[in-house]
Structures are given as structure tokens and as C-alpha cells.
Amino acid sequence: MYLKRNIINMQRSFSRQFHISVRNSIQSSKPLSNSTPLKGCSVGTILIRSPILTRQPSEFEKSIYKYNAELWNELSDPLPAEFYFKKGSVGEKDWQERQKTLKGKESPFETIFGKERKEMESNKLLDSATHLQSRVTEADTKNDERSTLRSLDKSLYLLVKKSKSSGWQFPNTPVTSSEKALHLLCQDLLKNILDENSLTWLVARHPLALLKTEQEKTFLLRARLLNGLDVPNLQNVYDWVWCTYDELKNKLSPSSWDSVKNILSDRL
């Protein structure tokens, strides 16, 4: 009992001394001036145009879908023809004829509805909006990297060049004062390079990645481009490109690519 009381007193004494030392150190430290520039520090934005189309399935996925469809057809219950067709009726004879033509066919759709499909295609509406559009756009054909209308099934990331001699990098701006939060600086940055009508959404207020060099540290925040199909020319930059994930490796510096390759993906 005596030993336990001594241990409790020692813990209280240590805790009291620790809090006093922390309070004294805080009081003795000088407050950081809000107007002090943060040298070698900048904030950037990973601006993403989200995928617009679903991705194309791989050959392996296509084979799985085909196998599952065939298996489902084999395991499905046969149609109770005696319930739907009267014995000896014209409908029963037509049904039996169609069943004979289905033997050995992988898909019975064309055999059963082939005639109806041709009639439907011959009576197409004149409105072009009802027709299927190609997944390959004009920007894909011309390899226009400035357009957001390319690679519609993948995410696109904005890279800029500040001058002719500089390399490709994410849009960034130096942090000249500690009075403004990082996410507010990112919003001002996007307003500076994009049109005022462009709509963006900052995903979070905290940094997603850190690009660190000997001269500078760049904190990256993530933002999404909401009007991804109508992006005007960028302002206050020398050049810009919208890159897929695979193209980032060839554009960014090796150190920058190593910092972001594990936090970005082909479809983000």
C-alpha cells in the first residue's frame, strides 16, 4: 500500500513538472509574424478531368462475360410452350420452327429478332442525337493534347509550362504570406489560369502530396474540373497539356513522378 502511494505521488509530480515546462516554453517562444514570407514554399493543384465514358473491357473480361451468358442460357429453365401455345396452333408451329434454327447458335437473339432489328434500323429517327457516337473523338485523331475531349474513358491531369525553358509541372504558385490558407491560394490559382466561367471543385483543404527539391517544397491539393467538355484556353501560362496517367511519366521530372505515381491512377 505504501509503495503504491509513492508511485502515484511520483506520477503526479512528473506530470506537474512536465506541464509547467511546456507552458514556460510556449510563453518564452516568440509568435510567428503573419506577414513573414515562407521562402522556398509553394502550393499547387492537381486538376483532374474525370472519365466521361466507361472503359473498354479487356479480352479476358469479354471472355468471362461470354462464358457467363452461355452458362446462364444453359442453366435457365426452358420455356413452357404448352402453357403459352395451344397444341396444334399456328403459334406452336412457328415456335417449333424457330427452335430448330437455334441449334448450334451461340446467341439466339439474331435468329429470333433479326427481322425486327432490320425493320427498326430502316425506320431510324432523323435526329442525330439518338445515334451512337464514336468513342474516338476528333481530338484523339489529331492528338490534340490541349483538348479535354480526348481519352474520354480515362482521367486527364493538367500540366503547365510557366515559360519556354521551364519543364512541365502541375499549376502552382508561391506562398508569400502565412495569412492565407493553402486551399484559398489554390482557388485563386485556378481563377488566374482558367476562364471565370470554368467550374472547379476543390476536393479537400489538406495537401495530397509533397514535391520536395533542394530549393523548394510544393504542397499539392486535388481539384476536379466539373465542366470538362467546355474548357477555354488557359491564361497566364506559356503552354498547357491534358495528360493521361500513362503520359505523366514522360512529362514530369523523375522526382515529381515518384511523388505522385502512387496517389494517381488511370481512372480517378
Curated annotation (Swiss-Prot):
GO terms of molecular function: structural constituent of ribosome
Signal sequence residues: none
Keyword field contains Ribonucleoprotein: yes
Locations listed in the record: Mitochondrion
The entry's keywords: Mitochondrion, Ribonucleoprotein, Ribosomal protein, Transit peptide
Functional summary from the UniProt entry: Component of the mitochondrial ribosome (mitoribosome), a dedicated translation machinery responsible for the synthesis of mitochondrial genome-encoded proteins, including at least some of the essential transmembrane subunits of the mitochondrial respiratory chain. The mitoribosomes are attached to the mitochondrial inner membrane and translation products are cotranslationally integrated into the membrane.
Quaternary structure and interacting proteins, as annotated: Component of the mitochondrial large ribosomal subunit (mt-LSU). Mature yeast 74S mitochondrial ribosomes consist of a small (37S) and a large (54S) subunit. The 37S small subunit contains a 15S ribosomal RNA (15S mt-rRNA) and at least 32 different proteins. The 54S large subunit contains a 21S rRNA (21S mt-rRNA) and at least 45 different proteins.
Protein name: Large ribosomal subunit protein mL46
Source organism per UniProt: Schizosaccharomyces pombe (strain 972 / ATCC 24843) (Fission yeast)
Annotated gene: mrpl17
